[in-house]
Amino acid sequence: MKQFLTAAIVTLLMTAGYYHLQEDDTNDFERWALKNNKFYTESEKLYRMEIYNSNKRMIEEHNQREDVTYQMGENQFMTLSHEEFVDLYLQKSDSSVNIMGASLPEVQLEGLGAVDWRNYTTVKEQGQCASGWAFSVSNSLEAWYAIRGFQKINASTQQIVDCDYNNTGCSGGYNAYAMEYVLRVGLVSSTNYPYVAKNQTCKQSRNGTYFINGYSFVGGSQSNLQYYLNNYPISVGVEASNWQFYRSGLFSNCSSNGTNHYALAVGFDSANNWIVQNSWGTQWGESGNIRLYPQNTCGILNYPYQVY
């Protein structure tokens, strides 16, 4: 009888603990959903909560490791599987398209310190649209205007998404093609042509207000990219498949050196680590930025183009 009571008590405690853990998981999910304005049907809610808890455990296990150089954290992507994240936020990886101009001779750097242009353009949120290529170009334009002392502008990314027919809107594109469009047509203000995170019919029938003089390929080596970053930020192609839950630190966990996303290189630190501004909002990363190890980490040297 005593053994039976002991077993019953242990079972009761284990069951209570299990339900307590389940309740904690549910509460965490509910808090996340409220913070991120996510609303689900009852059937989808169970599915999304399962993904949330799986991602949460993966993040916790990663952060407990002593051999990692970066931390993961919860963000707006918590209820997306890795496959869904790649499909919704990144474009198809394509390293076969040759958009590169003439190769550059390697620049010899002397006495060039750290560079940081983060304060010259604001972090944007692309939403569920693979438009990082367009944001990297419109943000390049904004930073160029600000650094040259012209004015603080908000260039329309949606205009590039809708009207640059050499690219494919929310399905992806290439920074050099987008810069060619800005060179020919110019951009209007985002106030007049706001971002909606989806493909639309082009609404711009006249030339824009903000133009560039040209653009050039500035990659091929660490020293080249650093040299040109000393002037202005640079639109770069990157391989971002594993960026989903990046929170802070130095990142090098790239799936390859291909290109499935575009972002804005805004500087480098005294240890030559790259500082890259993304377009996934400030809840992601280091207030919207990621730091990458030097050299060609995540393919950053493959498709860097700079406006001038």
Swiss-Prot record:
Keywords for this protein: Disulfide bond, Hydrolase, Protease, Secreted, Signal, Thiol protease, Zymogen
Entry keyword annotation includes Ligase: no
Residues in the signal sequence: 1-21
Site entry: Ancestral active site Cys: G132
Any one GO molecular-function label of the UniProt entry: cysteine-type endopeptidase activity
Tree of life domain: Eukaryota
Keyword Signal among UniProt keywords: yes
A cellular-component GO term for this protein: extracellular space
Catalytic activity: Specificity close to that of papain. As compared to cathepsin B, cathepsin L exhibits higher activity toward protein substrates, but has little activity on Z-Arg-Arg-NHMec, and no peptidyl-dipeptidase activity
InterPro entries to which the protein is assigned, alphabetical: Papain-like_cys_pep_sf (IPR038765), Peptidase_C1A (IPR013128), Peptidase_C1A_C (IPR000668), Peptidase_C1A_papain-like (IPR039417), Prot_inhib_I29 (IPR013201)
Disulfide bridge partners, by residue number: C129-C170, C254-C298
CDD domains recorded: Peptidase_C1A
One GO term of the biological process aspect: proteolysis involved in protein catabolic process
Prodomain positions: 22-110
Entries under SMART domains matching the protein: Inhibitor_I29, Pept_C1
Active-site residues (renumbered): H261, N278
UniProt-annotated location(s): Secreted
Enzyme class: hydrolase
SUPFAM superfamilies in the cross-refs: Cysteine proteinases (SSF54001)
Pfam family membership, one: Peptidase_C1
EC number(s) stated in the UniProt entry for this protein: 3.4.22.15
Annotated family: Belongs to the peptidase C1 family.
PANTHER family: CYSTEINE PROTEASE FAMILY C1-RELATED
Role according to the record: May be involved in extracellular digestion.
Protein name: Putative cathepsin L 3
Organism: Paramecium tetraurelia
